[in-house]
Amino acid sequence: MTIDLDDASPIDFHGKLAVLELVVSSLVAGGYFVFSQFGVVAASLWKLVLAAQLFVSTVMILHYVMNRRPRRLWVEGIVSMLMLFPFLMIALLWLFYLLSIPIPLVLKVSVIAACFALIARHAFLVLSDFRRAAKIESVVQTIYHDNGKNLVLRHSCGGYIDGLTARNPLKPGVLSVVAYLTPLAAALGGNVNHVFGENIGPHVLCIAFSLLAFPMTLSLVGNFYVRQLFFRVYLPLKLERRTGKRVILAQ
């Protein structure tokens, strides 16, 4: 397996990404502002998205300034989990919609709890796959290169790490899609009378986007965030304690 240790490190782009993400989040906030005018999401949601993105962009800029030289992987790992904030806000549309529609409280709580249970289950299974793979020394050596002084993350191993688990909610599979979307369908079914009693257009859009967004939430939280937390935060800290060497990003 040929791997280039000198390809661009994500930290080198955090300054520009901080600005780009602010633009993307502004567009997301604009979409939620429009939805809020139709009463399908909370009126304050778009403001919260913008405020949270300002915080995320500030953290990214501080990280770029403070960690560009040390290049500590576990620090970059934490920041990298914040970087997908705009996409997480899109993926959580189903949650924001469920919180806003006037369905019975018991049904609302039950459906949201069921959805988060599915997310937690998927994340746990992916984490179990990663923990099992990390027990194999050759896997760890493939991901982290020992240059004698430090352990260096091989940037080109993203696809290799993804291949350590076959669990991907975005893969086509009728049974899995039906299973994942059943809780949402129950809540949306309970909202039928409300939907057809008002302007149907915004609700139809939110329902369609919610059904698409839930598998996206599963993928972001259950795959991406678990991967980042395990291979860029937990495992680097564990390796630093075990070897006495810093785990860093390549220059």
What positions do the PLM features span?
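N-terminal first transmembrane alpha-helix
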Residues: M1-A114, I200-S210
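Charge-rich cytosolic interhelical loops and cytosolic tails of multi-pass membrane proteins
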Residues: M1-D4, L107-V174, T243-A250
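Cytosolic/matrix-facing juxtamembrane and C-terminal tails of multi-pass cellular membrane proteins
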Residues: M1-K16, N150, L164, L220-Q251
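Loop-to-transmembrane boundary segments
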Residues: D7-V24, V152-A185
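Alpha-helical membrane-embedded segments
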Residues: F55, K108-L125, V178-G189, G201-Y225
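Inner-leaflet juxtamembrane helices
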Residues: N67-R72, L127-I136, N223-L237
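Hydrophobic alpha-helical membrane segments
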Residues: L82-A91, K171-N191
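Hydrophobic alpha-helical transmembrane segments in multi-pass integral membrane proteins
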Residues: L88-L98, L151-Y160, A186-G190
